[in-house]
């Protein structure tokens, strides 16, 4: 079950909460007409929901294919913004990263942390796993998330799969200390420089 199973979609919301690029439109959610926000560039729909107690209200990304939601957490940058989206396995999780959650403003942000911080063996590079025990598209990064509260030191960097305001998806590295992000580029440093 989703952690949002006991959340309720609110029929209207304040459109000033939306970043540039999203447009407000009516949407039929489970037979009810509600306001939604839609980013055509990325085919992303936001709904405003809250808990049964009327708390923890906010915009959430709605995935119609499995009737699930995830917190909408935009990270603002110099020329736009990025926000975490559901990980699609077309792009392998970078080597040496382990699944976790970023504690961000009472929101749930699925992310990855550098495996060395977890005191666990290094994860296998995506695509090099034992094919007999893993399902197609599955990697060691798909294991149960590591709680950052259980670590000896809090991570300073979190890797997340996200989308920018132009609808482009990629991995992004969030610097917890500086409050900044950048597109993640994995570099091959295994060769010697002469």
Predicted features, each with a name:
Residues 1-193:
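Soluble mature domains adjacent to a membrane tether on cell-surface and organelle-surface proteins
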């Amino acid at each position: 079950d989703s952690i949002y199973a006991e959340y309720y979609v609110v029929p209207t919301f304040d459109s000033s909460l939306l970043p540039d690029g999203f447009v407000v439109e009516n949407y039929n959610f489970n037979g009810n007409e509600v306001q939604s926000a839609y980013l055509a560039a990325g085919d992303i729909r936001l709904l405003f929901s809250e808990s049964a107690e009327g708390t923890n209200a906010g915009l959430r990304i709605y995935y119609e294919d499995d009737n699930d939601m995830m917190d909408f957490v935009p990270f603002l940058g110099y020329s736009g913004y990025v926000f975490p989206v559901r990980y699609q396995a077309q792009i392998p999780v970078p080597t040496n990263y382990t699944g976790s959650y970023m504690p961000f403003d009472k929101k749930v942000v699925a992310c990855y942390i550098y495996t060395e911080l977890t005191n666990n063996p290094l994860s296998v590079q995506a695509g090099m796993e034992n094919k007999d025990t893993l399902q197609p598209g599955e990697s060691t990064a798909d294991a149960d998330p590591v709680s950052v509260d259980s670590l000896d030191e809090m991570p300073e960097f979190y890797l997340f799969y996200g989308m920018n305001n132009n609808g482009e998806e990629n991995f992004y590295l969030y610097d917890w200390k500086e409050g900044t992000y950048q597109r993640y580029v994995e570099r091959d440093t295994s060769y010697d420089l002469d």
